[in-house]
A protein has these predicted regions:
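Bacterial N-terminal signal peptides
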Residues: 9-17
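Short helix-initiation/N-cap motifs at beta->coil->alpha
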Residues: 67-82
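Bacterial N-terminal signal peptides that target proteins for export
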Residues: 1-9
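Residues at or immediately flanking beta-strands
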Residues: 26, 63-67
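Contiguous mixed-secondary-structure segments that line small-molecule binding/active-site clefts
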Residues: 51-58, 63, 85, 90, ...
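Sec/Tat signal peptide C-region and signal peptidase I cleavage site
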Residues: 17-24
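Extracytoplasmic "Venus flytrap"
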Residues: 28-50, 71-75
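Nucleotide donor/acceptor-binding cores
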Residues: 25-27, 165
Length: 165
C-alpha cells in the first residue's frame, strides 16, 4: 500500500513538473545593434537595455526567457514593426521612425534636436504629440516598455549641438 501511494505521489509530482515546464515561455527580442562586447568590454547601450530586461526576467524566476537577436539577425531594422503588431516578434528596440511607412507621424520622433537632454525627454514624453503617438502604438497592439531618447542628433567634433544655431 505504501509503495502504491509513493508511486502515485511520484506520478503527480512528475505530472506537475511537466505541466509547469509546458508553461515556460520564450520571448523573441530583436534589434539592429551589435550584441558583442567592444574592445573595452562595454556593449552598445541599446543592446544593454534589452539585455537588462532579459536578465531581470531570468532573475524573477517566472519561466519567461528572453532570447535576444542582435545585429539584424532576426529582422532588418525597418521590418520589425509589422511582426510586433502580429505577434511574430515579442520585443524590439528600434527608432520609432523606422515604422513611419505604416504611421507617418512616427517620423517626428526622429527629428534631430527634438530632445535636448534627459529632463527634456521626460517632459516631452507627456506632450500632446507623444500622447497621440502612444495612442497609435497602443491601438496597433504594441506596448512601450521604455522610452529611450538620445539628446542631440547632430554631429560635431568639438561639442554637443542641441539646436540649429
Amino acid at each position: 500500500m505504501f509503495k502504491k501511494i509513493s508511486l502515485y505521489i511520484t506520478a503527480i509530482a512528475l505530472a506537475l513538473t511537466m505541466v509547469s515546464s509546458a508553461y515556460a515561455v520564450t520571448l523573441k527580442a530583436s534589434h539592429q545593434w551589435p550584441g558583442t562586447a567592444r574592445a573595452d568590454g562595454s556593449y552598445d547601450p541599446r543592446h544593454e537595455m534589452v539585455q537588462i530586461i532579459a536578465d531581470e526576467m531570468k532573475k524573477a524566476n517566472v519561466d519567461v526567457d528572453v532570447r535576444i537577436y542582435p545585429a539584424k539577425s532576426l529582422y532588418k531594422p525597418k521590418e520589425q514593426w509589422k511582426p510586433m503588431t502580429t505577434g511574430q516578434l515579442d520585443m524590439s528596440a528600434f527608432p520609432l521612425g523606422y515604422a513611419a511607412k505604416f504611421h507617418p507621424e512616427f517620423d517626428a520622433t526622429l527629428m534631430p534636436g527634438t530632445v535636448k537632454n534627459h529632463k527634456h525627454a521626460l517632459k516631452f514624453n507627456k506632450s500632446p504629440m507623444m500622447v497621440e503617438i502612444k495612442k497609435i502604438i497602443n491601438d496597433a497592439g504594441v506596448i512601450v516598455l521604455s522610452d529611450a531618447w538620445l539628446g542631440g542628433g547632430f554631429a560635431s567634433k568639438s561639442k554637443c549641438i542641441r539646436n540649429p544655431r
